[in-house]
Amino acid sequence: MDTSNAAGNSSNDQIEVFFDGLCQPYNPGGIACYAFIIKKQQEDPQTIHSEYGLAAEPFTDYATNNVAEYTGIIKALEWLLLQQTSELNNNHTATESIIIKGDSQLVIYQIKGRYKVKAIKIIPLYQKVMSLISKFNDIHFEWIPREKNSEADKLTNYAYTKIIDSDPTLRKKIGQHMATEQQLEFLKNLGISPEKYLSKIEAKRLISKIKKYRHNI
């Protein structure tokens, strides 16, 4: 097991995993969703599997962004372990180097041992991750900026939208937390198409980021 960065590893057998998690319309205690995408690293990288879902019971203390991030890693590792077991059972050698990439610096650095895990609800998830990665021979973790994790980010937002679409009770409960007409109009005037269930908090973050960017140019 190796949880260091895999920088410089150009092996054609490398597997890349991009994971993400969110908790909206507020964190903690909102609707926590996870997603992950697994790619085979080659000249033209191919997605070999992707998955998304609910990370915790909505509107509970357990529903947090970090729970969702950890759930994404756990689900990805469980899928990879299943594939590895299948290969070994078919007398194939599981030789791929695996690199797990995410934009949560906290989660990545906890797994790499740079940060301590202090939150009670995260400890069992962290222990589960460490147990799973011990089953792989060549596995690495790398923090990436949010803009380089756009596919996984879009998939978590898709999961969030799909879950709310399927449950009228959830739609009713989040109503007061949705972005205001003024916020939506501001974003649309900039050519930005807001997510279907964009929260006030997320809209405020986006607008602040845009204003800061425009001020600096």
Q: Where are the regions that the model predicts?
A:
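RNase H-like nuclease fold core
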Residues: 2-67, 71, 78-79
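RNase H catalytic domain
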Residues: 22-26, 74-161
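Exposed beta-strand and adjacent loop surfaces of beta-rich binding modules
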Residues: 33, 97, 184
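General secondary-structure propensity
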Residues: 55-62, 138-142, 190-192
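A short glycine-/small-residue-rich loop at the edge of a beta-strand within enzyme catalytic domains
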Residues: 63, 67, 120, 143, ...
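Interfaces that engage single-stranded nucleic acids at replication/repair/recombination sites
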Residues: 162, 166-217
